[in-house]
Amino acid sequence: MNDEMITGKLMNALRGDERYEVIESLDNSEIRGANVVSVGVDETAQANVGLPDYRSRVSVYVSSHVSEDDTGQSFKDICQEVMRRLEKYTLQEAPLSSLFEEVPVVGFFFDRSKMMTVDDTYGKCYLAHLEYTVITSF
């Protein structure tokens, strides 16, 4: 339940830009497509034994087909926009409650990013994997 709530809140924060579509990654895997941003919780584990806090690893994937974006500029712009929308929360410039609302999040951190070009059934894709950590306390 909490994983779905976290995913939903992040998806809402990323929606509203006509350049890309935001979808949920149900099987916690990368989803490739033309200007697609997918969000999913990879795993959740107890952060501190004996305390009601949990650490969730969240993946945000950004993908774009090379055939539709030969310079990669659209892909780069979408990646920058996705990171910009979440950065104010990871840098604590905005309260976490304004992003996660009723979900009791006490920490939100950007962990790492990885960008690559991959081949799939539709041809070459640009792919970015942005990884975040969410700490909740219930």
Which ranges hold each PLM region?
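Charged, often glycine-rich, active-site loop that binds/positions anionic groups
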Residues: G33-D42
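Charged, amphipathic alpha-helical segments and their flanking helix caps
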Residues: M1-S25, S29, D42-F138
